[in-house]
Amino acid sequence: MNKKLLLAAGLALMSAAASAQEVKFYNTGRKWNSSFDALLNGNSIHRVTRKGAETVSPETNLQLQVTTIVGGAETVADFAIAEGYQAEAPTDQLAVITAPASFIKTLAARSEVLYVNKSEQLFPTMHLVRNETGVTKVTEGAGLDTPYDGTGVVVGVIDQGFEFKHPAFLNACKKWGSSATSGMLKNSAPFNDPNDNEGHATHVANIAVGRKVEGCNYYGVATGAELLPMMSNLSTSSTIAQAAAIKKYAEGEGKPWVINMSFGSNSGPHDGSSDTDQNMDKLSTKGGILVGAMGNSGAEKLHVMHKFTEDGEKAFFYIKLDDQLNTNSVVYSEVWSANEGEGLLTIRPAVLSRGKLCYPTAVQMNAAGQTFEAEVSPFNNRQYGKFSGYFKQLLTKMGLNTGEFVWEVEGKAGAECHAWLNTDLAAGAFAKTKLTLDDKVYTTPEGDGNYATGAGAASIPSSISVASYNNATSFTSLSGNSYSYASFVGEVADISNFSSRGPSLSTDPKALPTPTIAAPGGVVISAFSKKAKSFSTDATENVQKVTSGGTPFYYGVMSGTSMATPVVTGIIALWLQANPELTSDDVAAILQKTARKDSYTGRNLTWSKEWGYGKIDAYEGLKEAIRMRPDGVNQTLNSVAPVTLQKGNDAWKVLFNNDESYANVRVIAANGQVAYAQHVVAPQHGDELVVNTQTLAPGVYVFQVSTTASTVTRKMIVK
């Protein structure tokens, strides 16, 4: 066996047990994505990336996502390995294979294979947390005081930009991801993360599980959880394989798990139906939760929609590119039908030049390196059109000096379509303008930020999708200067300006709403990676420097739903420690019941496209998680960690973690007098006792809870 085969066999593959959830698939008559056609015909294409144009030849290795019949993925992966290619089977219906386009027809000919798709690129969703959510430092004498710290729970973080040696992660890991493109694990930390551009992963992982570092107050939510860091190139093929690896490892250890996904994109149907979303959904299970960032497109005009009232009606969507941020004039946009079926829409890319619409031919688009797909998706039976490329090159091939991109969509009565601009790759906006065509005036719609659920993470049907609000808008840097980000993030306590809005276009009644919940994501201080390409010791965002082992390490400010998501991930880790059998539906029910409402969310909020169910509350959610715990699970009579305390200004709440024979709760004044006493007979897990502190005189007290096995004593300050 040659080295290539040895490598493939080494990477090989785990295959998840067959899931009860079968991938929804429609036979459209095609066995592969139409974007492969040019390659299969022997032509090279140009792919849009953040680094610029990338030429792809028929022999360039691609990350392929191969959908199979139930139970067929492992067989297909083994076949690819035998042919000398790298392959994995993250689920029983998906094989991810690294191979050139020339291998696609060979794969498609196999009886197990339903469809060969391309991998999509995802992006980090980055654009004072603990107190705000009810998780705070006990030493401050306020907030949540609980024995639950995530111990026994695996927190997987799939991301880019880990500084593995940061003291925030000291003794936090037993395994590490060893490849940015697969689910391989290793027993030691990699030397560095090849995709560390901004230190994103370091910031994110510390929010979720960062350890306490001497001299630093910026530690994580679940400080006892086990971190499994998976450095990733964030292609959908990679993230699926890495999520499956986290699940396999945690379940092999007999531990519940939660995966943080602070990434996404504005590609796809935004309905949770893609092969990525459906197969990620298969991983979700009892004691296994996926958490995804909504995205940072809330302030962008990246979405438009149109409902057709008569056959033959036309709609036009005009894209105004940002000349300063999009100097290469990249267009990356999609139009999707909201209705199942073929022939409801005719989708055409066009160029508006000197008041006329010009339609590029396939020859012109190919010559300019553009990619245009127009087909019916086999995963939701909906038509779509997708255009990507460098627009100025297209103008040249069309013989035009000037022009702007326009979608032309013709529909049948009752049809509805949505269009999105992928602003991660193509800065711009859908803009309002007037078009006069054949003596008829059309007004193109101005874009909005609706229906912008991040693809590949928040869009997964069972994912807990997270919006961002602001717990802070300013900070003081290492230099001692104060800075305000209010113009960017918005007002304190309000939804962050950048936080992407829902809802999803899903028609699946079992899919969770997007967003599901909101957490602090604006101006969050967490660990920085000094190995990031963008890092500077003089950066304004640096807030604190600590020294560990003679080496300096840093903490600083980032904002985004990327930062809000690990807050929720860490809190769910606490809940999983208390109740390791929680499902995603259980977590969603807890969030729906316990989310905080205020004047910003609306006090009568049930759900909204901005907030989901409201602001996450760690304590109230923990109470519900304990109450939902089935008999016989993690219940210890007369335990040594009997209670969780929620310390408020007006009252202290005593939550019983387990069943106890009895409990005595006392508040003792400095002079030794008992100011409050309550005997509780046989409290059960999830029971709560509220001690009103407003009846106490200002001063320092001892708060004491005694049970058969232990006594918990805390200092109480009443002002």
Predicted regions located by residue number:
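Autoinhibitory N-terminal propeptides
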Residues: 5-12, 18-145, 152-155
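C-terminal tail/sorting-segment detector
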Residues: 20, 654, 677, 698-719
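C-terminal subdomain of the subtilisin-like protease fold in secreted/lumenal serine endopeptidases
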Residues: 53-55, 252-265, 269, 283, ...
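Subtilisin-like serine protease catalytic core
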Residues: 142-239, 254-257, 272, 285-289, ...
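Active-site core segment of subtilase-fold serine proteases
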Residues: 146-149, 160-202, 206, 253, ...
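Catalytic-core environment of secreted peptidases
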Residues: 174, 182-186, 352-353, 371, ...
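Hydrolase catalytic cores
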Residues: 205-208, 228-235, 247-255, 332-350, ...
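Glycine-centered tight-turn motifs at strand-turn-strand junctions
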Residues: 650, 674-695, 709-712
